[in-house]
Amino acid sequence: MSSFQFEQIGVIRSPYKEKFAVPRQPGLVKSANGELHLIAPYNQADAVRGLEAFSHLWILFVFHQTMEGGWRPTVRPPRLGGNTRMGVFATRSTFRPNPIGMSLVELKEVVCHKDSVILKLGSLDLVDGTPVVDIKPYLPFAESLPDASASYAQSAPAAEMTVSFTAEVEKQLLTLEKRYPQLTLFIREVLAQDPRPAYRKGEETGKTYAVWLHDFNVRWRVTDAGFEVFALEPR
């Protein structure tokens, strides 16, 4: 059996500082923009010449936060309620023999300055610090297949949770929006996806959660109406 070694070509900069609450696919949280910073020796303007003519990219990356857990032959996809097992190769699970992921993202801008090459990205589903091993332009004529079937994931999951904020948090957000544009919308879109583990859904009201987004620990509670954000703590 052959083995291969790959070099990291870049790193992701993202508002998601931990894997909890990262959307399961790009495009679900529209306000979650990020960047891909190429690293030496790949941070050359020549390496991205012509890339600006493409609207979207495939990013191939490493599941660096789960790779120590090894691979599993079967997993439980969240879209199936977290109870039904499927073969790992029939899912997008992180627990793969080779911890490689792929993400289709919008390319907003290519910025080259001296030894810096930065790709400005649209809505993404990657944790801050994610290692990138390759990028490829998206080719609509070959890769857009409207008639394809996709089993349990034929359509995007609905944003099912109503998200509200306490008066104190709303006051904080008004001030923070100057430095973090669309912060309120970002938090709302992330939590509306209901990032809780599938087995936690349907639990009693009052349960609290926290997630690290941007530079803040966002704390929220389960209510009869959905989720209520009650604290925004700088980190």
Feature locations, PLM:
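Arg/Lys-rich, positively charged N-terminal/basic patches that mediate binding to nucleic acids
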Residues: 1-45, 51-53, 140-190
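Short coil-to-beta-strand transition motifs
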Residues: 2-8, 95-105, 214
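Short, conserved beta-turn/loop elements at beta-strand boundaries and strand-helix junctions
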Residues: 17, 110-116, 225
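Active-site-adjacent substructure of cysteine-protease-like catalytic cores
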Residues: 49-101, 191-193, 200-204
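Short, solvent-exposed secondary-structure boundary/capping segments
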Residues: 114-124, 229-230
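Flexible glycine-rich active-site/ligand-binding loops centered on an Asp-His dyad
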Residues: 119-153
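Enriched for short, Lys/Arg-rich terminal
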Residues: 217, 222-235
